[in-house]
C-alpha cells in the first residue's frame, strides 16, 4: 500500500486525533461544552480531518497485512457498517420513518463512487503516469453486479404494479433484499476464492513493504472507526496501483447496495413503513449514463486523463441537478 513507510511504527497523530475527537464528543454530550459556536466547531473540524487521515493509515496497515483483494473488502465492509447504522438510526428516529433515506443514500453513493472517486483517481493517475492499466475482467465483473443491483433497487420499483408509487410490495422487497445479499456474496466468493487473480494488480509479486505483525494489525483494526475510501483510492491511483483503487471504489458501491438494502428491508418490515426506492426520471438518466460511461472505461483495461474527465463531468452534472432540480 502506498504511503506506509514502516507498518510497525504508528505516528502519534494516528491515535491522538481519534482520542481527542472522542473526548470532544463526550464533553459535548455531557453538557460540559456548548453544542454550537466557533470555539467548538473549529476544533471539531480539525479533529475530524485528523481522524480521517488516521483512518487512512490504519486501513492501509490492515489491507497491507491481509493483501489484495481482501484489503479492499475490509475497507468496504467497515464503511458500509457505519453507513447502515446511520440509515437505520434515521429511519427509527424520524416520525414518518424516512422512507426515501435508503434510496437517496444508495444513489448518492453510486454517483459519488462511479463518477467522483473513480473520475478523480483516473484523472490524477493519468496526469502522473500518462496511462494506467488494470484487469478488465475483474473491473467489468464488479460493474456488471453493480449495474444489476442498481437497476433492481433504484429503477424497477417505478414500473411495478402491485404497489402504487416508486415502491415494492413486501414480497417483492424481500426478494430484492435476498438477491442483493446473495449476489454480493457471490461476488465476494469470486473475488476472494474462485477468480482472485482478476482483482490483483497486473504483475503483482512480493509486496515492496514489510508485512506488519499481528499486533500491529490488531491495533489498527481497533482504531479503524471510519473509512475515507476516496483518499485511499486516490493514493492508490497516485502510486500507479489503479487496480487497488478500482477494487476500493467498486467494492464500496457493491457493499452499499448488497448490505444496506437487506438491513433497511428488515427495519422497514418491522416498523411498517414502505421503502421509497424508485428514482425520479432525471436521476435515472444520470444513473444509466454513469453505468454506460463506466462500461466503456472499464472494458478497455487501460485509462488516461480523458476517461477521468468524462466521469468528473457526469459527477458535476449530478451535483448541479441535485442542487438545482
Give the positions of each predicted feature.
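Hydrophobic alpha-helical segments, chiefly the membrane-spanning helices
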Residues: 1-325
